[in-house]
């Protein structure tokens, strides 16, 4: 059976209203993950992402998530003022192109872009576009790293929009970005705001000069922390990473995009090596069952958490 699309609404015009509403409020949602490699050509990367989004939609995807900063190489490996030229307004040219595809294919699109807010203020931002092509808004990355080969503080102002959820045609989405995934507070707040699914567009990899044991440890930690957010909050988690060699071969982005259910079980896991455009079905109706069997939200002691707002709890 082909998935229902925005563009097909007229087919059901003769149905009673309650039946039409029921058809489009089903709890099973098809998630498209686009794991791809990038080049130094922004236009080619965008064209490739649009094609893969269409491919995912053709396979039945209703929500498609692209990786972090998908229109370029991961440029934050160096501090170079020339890279600011890669930024654009949001909404802007890329979101316009994505909106056209969203409307054509009837899919929601989650798109991570380098945002130029104004002169001298830039953000790492994800735009969300609904299945009718309408721009729903954006989330600006809150946690900005500054590590070797990840010099994001040089480029990005920390997000100032707070944590956000987006009510799309198919589900209520929470969107966080890469380094945000290491912080349980971000996942918790977004889940408490009503997110049914947490999405993490990501750009992470390992240095090719680093030993295999360390690389494996880091990769396992990356999976574990995100799966723990799924468990602690009773939500599905979707993480979409880039793949391929960059930085003149010194950095291998490890792919490994995945979907986890609210018990932390992998529903899907991509390879380390290959580009993949995959569609995974999840059932958001099961959230209540997960949360009642493991009632972590019920048992939270919100009266005792004030110390979490401190940088460190010093001895009095």
Task: Describe these PLM feature segments.
Residues 11-13:
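Short hydrophobic alpha-helical segments enriched in small aliphatic residues
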Residues 24-62, 199:
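N-terminal active-site segment of His-dependent metallophosphoesterases
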Residues 31, 129-136, 260-267:
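Short, glycine-anchored, charge-dense loop/turn motifs used at functional sites
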Residues 42, 51-132, 136-138, 204-228, ...:
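Cys-nucleophile CN-hydrolase/nitrilase-fold catalytic domain and related Cys-dependent amidase chemistry
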Residues 87-110, 178-277:
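CN hydrolase (nitrilase-like) catalytic-core segments centered on the catalytic cysteine
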Residues 87-90, 100, 117-225, 293-294:
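Active-site catalytic loop in hydrolytic enzyme cores
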Residues 285-316:
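A short C-terminal boundary segment appended to hydrolase-like catalytic domains
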